[in-house]
């Protein structure tokens, strides 16, 4: 049985219904972030789906040094705190160094370990020692069964509030594929599993100076993943993906989200 974990007033795992983790790839500015969060709350209330709001304060692994990275730790956490307090929604963001754990834990309900950093023992342990829920994204270079050892690092601290996220595996150059077998294997760890449906259609570095993406496949992969009985779906969204400052090619347009969530919710109800 998969552990049930509390994130604010939301329950994920066990036999609970699907949870949405969504927001812009990066905090572009305060107004846009609040606007996106408010829209997501309205959409999720309309389809009765729990929401965890996500946004990055720093995109530390952008393809180019010239790419927009976000407002940084201090200003970014201020914006996420405002989202959390004004809307009453749990918030998630990713950390990149041990020094970020303490200030992040003061605001975030969920601390995320980026896929590229999931093997960094000291970072995983420090994040888990904060006592917050930890979402560990599976590296594009790892097999699903490799995550058993990563989970072991986190729970060695006594914090077993761990979530795992699948975001695809490298397939040749500038491409990712999603192996549906990964989900039941990851759930065998005993912890909730989320599918990152938008990063999984990313084409890393595919545009030369930035990553490309194939958002037209988000729905298909999302439907397939939900059919395996996963616990949550992760999607980066934007009011106008073509103008997004990060990961626009694989972000879902907010206008398209309600119809997609209804389909995913229907599949989730059948398999649980």
UniProtKB/Swiss-Prot annotation:
Keyword Transferase on entry:
yes
Tell me where in or outside the cell this protein is found.
Answer: Cytoplasm
- Identify the Pfam families for this entry: DAHP_synth_1
One Gene Ontology term of the biological-process aspect is: keto-3-deoxy-D-manno-octulosonic acid biosynthetic process
Under InterPro entries, the record lists: Aldolase_TIM, DAHP1/KDSA, KDO8P_synthase
UniProt entry tagged with the keyword GTP-binding: no
Keywords for this protein:
Cytoplasm, Lipopolysaccharide biosynthesis, Transferase
Record family assignment: Belongs to the KdsA family.
Q: Which NCBIfam families match?
A: KDO8P_synth, PRK05198.1
Q: What is this protein called?
A: 2-dehydro-3-deoxyphosphooctonate aldolase
The protein's organism comes out as Geotalea daltonii (strain DSM 22248 / JCM 15807 / FRC-32)
């Amino acid at each position: 049985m998969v552990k049930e974990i509390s994130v604010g007033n939301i329950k994920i795992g066990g036999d609970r219904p699907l949870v949405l983790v969504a927001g812009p790839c990066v905090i572009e500015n305060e107004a846009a972030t609040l606007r996106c969060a408010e829209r997501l709350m309205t959409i999720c209330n309309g389809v009765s789906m729990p929401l965890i709001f996500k946004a990055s304060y720093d995109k530390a692994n952008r393809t180019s040094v010239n790419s927009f990275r976000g407002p940084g730790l201090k200003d970014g956490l201020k914006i996420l705190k405002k989202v959390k307090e004004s809307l009453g929604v749990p918030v998630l963001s990713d950390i990149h160094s041990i020094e970020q754990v303490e200030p992040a834990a003061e605001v975030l309900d969920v601390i995320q370990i980026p896929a590229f950093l999931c093997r960094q023992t000291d970072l995983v342990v420090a994040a888990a020692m904060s006592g917050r829920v930890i979402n560990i994204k599976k590296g594009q270079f790892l097999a699903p069964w490799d995550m058993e050892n990563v989970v072991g690092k986190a729970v060695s601290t006594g914090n077993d509030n761990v979530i795992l996220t699948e975001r695809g595996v490298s397939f040749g150059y500038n491409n990712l594929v999603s192996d549906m077998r990964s989900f039941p294997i990851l759930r065998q760890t005993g912890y909730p599993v989320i599918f990152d449906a938008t990063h999984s259609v990313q084409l890393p570095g595919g545009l030369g100076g930035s990553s490309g993406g194939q958002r037209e496949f988000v729905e298909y992969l999302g439907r397939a993943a939900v059919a395996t009985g996963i616990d949550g779906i992760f999607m980066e969204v934007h009011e106008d993906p073509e103008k997004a400052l990060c990961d626009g090619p694989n972000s879902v347009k907010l206008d398209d989200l309600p119809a997609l969530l209804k389909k995913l919710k229907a599949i989730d109800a059948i398999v649980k």
